[in-house]
Amino acid sequence: MTEIVADKTVEVVKNAIETADGALDLYNKYLDQVIPWQTFDETIKELSRFKQEYSQAASVLVGDIKTLLMDSQDKYFEATQTVYEWCGVATQLLAAYILLFDEYNEKKASAQKDILIKVLDDGITKLNEAQKSLLVSSQSFNNASGKLLALDSQLTNDFSEKSSYFQSQVDKIRKEAYAGAAAGVVAGPFGLIISYSIAAGVVEGKLIPELKNKLKSVQNFFTTLSNTVKQANKDIDAAKLKLTTEIAAIGEIKTETETTRFYVDYDDLMLSLLKEAAKKMINTCNEYQKRHGKKTLFEVPEV
């Protein structure tokens, strides 16, 4: 009977640690890396590079899009920081949990139970906070997607050959070309006519087609960005769904942990299983914190 109780305790405790570790591992390997933020940083810089290539109306939309993308990134990293904080607490608690196996008694068993419940409680709290931050991040992506649709329509109008914006760009090219032709004249009125003819050929045959190609490349850039933002929004939604499942699993195992008797006679194999589960989660925490810039990692107790 005692052995059955011990087996049950080991199963519950091991499952509790592994469930928390699994949620963290999911965040570490999937949720936290789902968006290629380096690409987005480069894209945000590109938004500024194109600022001379669209109308005032389009410029306002581009400014809104840039703000929304930066807001989304801020909230995403806020979620990352929340999980980082959980790791900081969990590593210390789990190290204390492992050390309590030395000269094991009922008081230490009770302390271990409190520790595990604390780890699970903090996990639920921090992952829920991360979930909320991801929701806001997703909403910003969604809003940016809507703005990009409006921008596409605006650019289509701007870049139409009949639009006032396109004509203003053509007029600017012609003015600069003809001014340059006039400045270069040395052969009297006939020279001016010839220079203007050459300028007209350059404008119509080269500069205006180049303008069309440049404007087309700008529109293609924003079309690609629109597709990227839509995919990012889908990825975050999928991440939130996975996280919801993990939070629910931690909640269930926490309830079971609270009702489990911890002070039982463990054999060496049982002790090894529990210690290894705790050490594995400490290592997962270390891996997560290292990837986010922590230089000095928590040492796993050798007991």
Swiss-Prot record:
- Indicate the impact reported for residue 165 to C: Strongly reduces cytotoxic activity
InterPro entries per record? Hemolysin_E
Q: What is the effect of changing residue 175 to R?
A: In strain: CH9802
Q: Does the keyword Transmembrane apply?
A: yes
Q: Where in the cell is it found?
A: Secreted; Periplasm; Host cell membrane
Top-level taxonomic group: Bacteria
Tell me what PTMs the record reports for this protein. In periplasm, it forms a disulfide bond between Cys-87 and Cys-285, which prevents the oligomerization. In outer membrane vesicles, the redox status prevents formation of the disulfide bond, leading to oligomerization and pore formation.
Q: Which UniProt keywords apply?
A: Cytolysis, Disulfide bond, Hemolysis, Host cell membrane, Host membrane, Membrane, Periplasm, Secreted, Toxin, Transmembrane, Transmembrane helix, Virulence
- Name the GO terms of the biological process aspect: hemolysis in another organism
Task: Tell me the disulfide pairings in this chain.
Answer: 87-285
Membrane-protein topology: Single-pass membrane protein
A Gene Ontology term for the protein's cellular component: host cell plasma membrane
The main place the protein resides is secreted
> What protein family does this chain belong to?
Belongs to the hemolysin E family.
Q: What does this protein do?
A: Toxin, which has some hemolytic activity towards mammalian cells. Acts by forming a pore-like structure upon contact with mammalian cells.
What is the name listed in the Swiss-Prot or TrEMBL entry for this protein?
Hemolysin E, chromosomal
Species the sequence originates in: Escherichia coli (strain K12)
Q: What is the lineage of its organism?
A: Bacteria, Pseudomonadati, Pseudomonadota, Gammaproteobacteria, Enterobacterales
